[in-house]
């Protein structure tokens, strides 16, 4: 992890910069969740994977790592609304502070920012992979919602969710 510390600092800077908006609720709400920390596992894995395949790191990889973290944060915001969660990372869920609608819309904003970061890498493969992954995430959430309360799910159906 120490090897990635400089790049992780760049990712943190990008997260703060790209969560900015003249609409005050957006940076307030997004920074509430982003600043709550977390392990930053997804950016670490992104940076480490780039190194493992001989990548030099740099701005494009940091943008990709920030995009992945924004996607993750957006899904957390949406998930807390769908699951009616009261806590996230030991703090009140954003939906309990700003409301469900604001949480969903800021999650949408973070998804949009992630795609902006991806396009800035100028690598359509990244956009293709992460847009497909975002669809899989959304489909999984809808499957989970549709299966809510169903006790007749087969093991395979459960695992598909």
Predicted feature residues:
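Short glycine/serine- and small hydrophobic-enriched flexible loop segments
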Residues: 47-51, 112-119
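Transmembrane helix-loop-helix
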Residues: 115-134
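Conserved N-terminal diphosphate/IPP-binding helix and adjacent helical/loop segment
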Residues: 1-73, 77, 81-96, 132, ...
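Mid-bilayer segments of alpha-helical transmembrane spans in multi-pass integral membrane proteins
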Residues: 101, 105, 113, 137-141
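Divalent-cation-assisted or electrostatically stabilized phosphate/pyrophosphate-binding catalytic cores
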Residues: 88-110, 151-161
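Hydrophobic (often cysteine-bearing) scaffold residues that line and stabilize catalytic clefts
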Residues: 41-42, 106-107, 126
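Short, well-ordered, mixed-charge alpha-helical segments that flank or form enzyme active sites
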Residues: 126-127, 136-139, 144-145
